[in-house]
């Protein structure tokens, strides 16, 4: 496990401790330890060998348990907690708006699963802390969670798939990703593979992951994700890979598929150029694939968070990491003052950060840190600081974090007002969605993106695997009218690698380097 995964396990344990009523102090201790781990930037294995010596919040009671997790990958205490709860309780954590305290309240009133929650319409409003409106919001979130529970984030499914591919590779079995995972849809229903081998060979390689066999197909599961393995013979491996990758509309568009050992042979026989898997969606039919976008040609790191707000990395370390990764400038964008939940910056915080930025710009020249902010778009559409403060930023990003359930017209007017604010440069993660967790704000996005184009506002493609917002389909539709920025939205050094996801979805949207703000020279920000 890495430090963020370890912190996540501690947070999970703290949640279950609260639901079970095993003591608020114990839950708080686990959360303090999780925060401390998130801020730690050193080597986790070395820290474990030292029994977490000197790390705030981790004392002699927790240290041996954490060391065991690092060394073995198992967390027996968490398994014990999970065993004390009805299985359905785990699902309730997927419902937006439900935390441990509310889940405990629901459990005390006999609501111990998603199905039980959905069947409680008219009853929830009678519980302490609930009313008719909160009941309606919770039931809407529960329906969304129910629709999402058979889906998995692309990034998580890809990690699980890579472990299976390694097992097959060790047995010298040729294998390739297929399906929506290979095409790079943001959420997937499972892992599809095409494998050159017999059922016996694959079973021997994958062991318990294979559960069933059909004609030419093995089925199973890896880390809770459904697994489908399509068995191929050498002459038709490429043909099966094209068909299994899809999309169905793309395969139908190709017509009858000839035999081919590799995909390239299939396309050559069809007298068509090979099409990269990310460009095989129905939305791409009839369109030419874009030119590749290279990470090493990016000039600007845009949208990241430091310890001034809710990031875990000090500003100087973040700048040094950006410099080391080849960027020539960085737009720091900590949260604005209204975002108290995320350590939003007060006016005095801004002054402190600006002084540090000015000093670092001298120290690290010609690398430059631009004074940015991720401003809350307030419910009335205004930005989060007075004009005399907004004018002092180099780059103002505006984003939605709250009031995502405003009525359609009201939400549209809210974002329209923000887009017309002369200080707004970037509309960040526009809809505010969290994949499989909550839908984005409902608004007239066609009208809003047209307005962004007219106002010259850059629209963000957020690379956080939980967001991937703006949706690539909207970006594809507006690729001829808008400029875009690629964001890591990094809250840690590891988060800087999420630029890979942003680059991938920029390609899936057919974007060119010239319309992507991260490829722009510094001067374009200073003299728009």
Task: Give residue spans per PLM region.
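Charged, compositionally biased N-terminal leader segments and the immediate start
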Residues: 1-22
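Catalytic cores of large soluble enzymes that bind and process phosphate-bearing ligands
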Residues: 2, 22-25, 58, 84, ...
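Accessory alpha-helical DNA-binding modules that contact the DNA backbone or grooves
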Residues: 14, 26-191, 195-227, 234-239, ...
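Short amphipathic alpha-helical interaction patches enriched in hydrophobic/aromatic residues
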Residues: 14-21, 146-150, 400, 404, ...
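Short loop/edge segments at beta-strand edges and connector loops
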Residues: 177-179, 371-373, 463
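Charged catalytic cores and adjacent phosphate/nucleic-acid-binding surfaces used
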Residues: 184-185, 189-306, 312-332, 337-367, ...
